[in-house]
């Protein structure tokens, strides 16, 4: 069973998600009211996961990315003010989170700073913006902000409820910019705001690589680095664990789907492994 570890309890991320969707009965107390609200939020999250605004390619990755349980774990609600860091041209999480919060909160996409010398980057930015502009009924008015790893403010300090980053930490480590980026996240969040992090999990039987050259990051190192930036660890979720991932590939984590950096070489073998073993953690700004 895939588990989510909280600071004081161990519970099943998928089981808790299913329980909320089922609207399990409890005694009529304040806890019941809270449970009902959480169940309603989770139901709305799942409606966005199942919604017609999502592309077929993104849906095909759900078995690896488990968007419903991850959002329930992060506790993103329709009223949340969410900043997603580097959502990518496909907008996997954009397709879910932007519709979820468009009426009661906001979704801001922190996208790469344009660079005319990088035509592929410029194409990706244009495709992402075109995707949003093509369906305002689903996505609402999504704001974008240019993001770089130099530690500049992303939004007005203290204005975000959530900063979410999926599979990005290794890039900032490789550039020697992780500390600056985490400091910017800390400034962006209000007191009590949450930082949600997903990253390819490195092996603990090998030395930590501060440059994350293979794309994998040791979980213990990531947690320590984020805590050093002023965050308090809240919980971890194991819904995206993958025991098939041996993390010893010729082209690092990019050997696996969806990248397949080796192209057709041993493609069936890597497809059978699936997407990487990943940790999912949440931290609060005190």
Predicted regions and their residues:
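Class I SAM-dependent methyltransferase Rossmann-like catalytic core
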Residues: 44-73, 77-78, 96
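A short acidic, Gly/Pro-enriched loop at the edge of an enzyme's catalytic core
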Residues: 153-163
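Conserved beta-strand signature within the Rossmann-like core of class I S-adenosyl-L-methionine
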Residues: 107-110, 192-200
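A short glycine-rich, Lys/Arg-flanked "PGG" loop and its adjoining helix->strand segment in the class I
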Residues: 98-99, 178-191
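A short, conserved alpha-helix within the catalytic core of class I
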Residues: 149, 171-184
């Amino acid at each position: 069973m895939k588990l989510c570890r909280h600071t004081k309890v161990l519970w099943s991320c998928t089981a808790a998600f299913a329980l909320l969707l089922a609207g399990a009965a409890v005694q009529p107390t304040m806890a019941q009211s809270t449970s009902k609200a959480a169940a309603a939020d989770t139901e709305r999250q799942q409606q966005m996961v199942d919604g017609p605004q999502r592309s077929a390619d993104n849906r095909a990755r759900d078995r690896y990315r488990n968007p419903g349980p991850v959002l329930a774990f992060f506790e993103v609600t329709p009223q949340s003010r969410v900043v997603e860091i580097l959502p990518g041209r496909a907008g996997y999480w954009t397709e879910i989170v932007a519709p979820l919060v468009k009426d009661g909160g906001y979704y801001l996409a922190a996208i790469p700073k344009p660079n005319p010398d990088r035509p592929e980057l410029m194409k990706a930015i244009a495709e992402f913006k075109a995707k949003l502009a093509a369906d305002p009924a689903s996505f609402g008015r999504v704001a974008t902000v240019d993001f770089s790893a130099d530690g500049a403010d992303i939004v007005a300090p203290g204005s975000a409820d959530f900063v979410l980053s999926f599979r990005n930490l290794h890039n900032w480590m490789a550039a020697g910019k992780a500390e600056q980026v985490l400091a910017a996240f800390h400034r962006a969040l209000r007191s009590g705001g949450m930082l949600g992090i997903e990253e390819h999990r490195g092996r603990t039987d090998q030395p930590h690589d501060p440059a994350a050259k293979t794309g994998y990051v040791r979980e213990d190192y990531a947690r320590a680095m984020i805590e050093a930036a002023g965050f308090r660890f809240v919980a971890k979720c194991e819904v995206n664990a993958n025991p098939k991932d041996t993390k010893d590939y010729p082209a690092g984590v990019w050997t696996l789907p969806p990248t397949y950096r080796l192209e057709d070489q041993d493609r069936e073998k890597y497809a059978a492994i699936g997407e990487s073993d990943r940790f999912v953690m949440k931290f609060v700004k005190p």
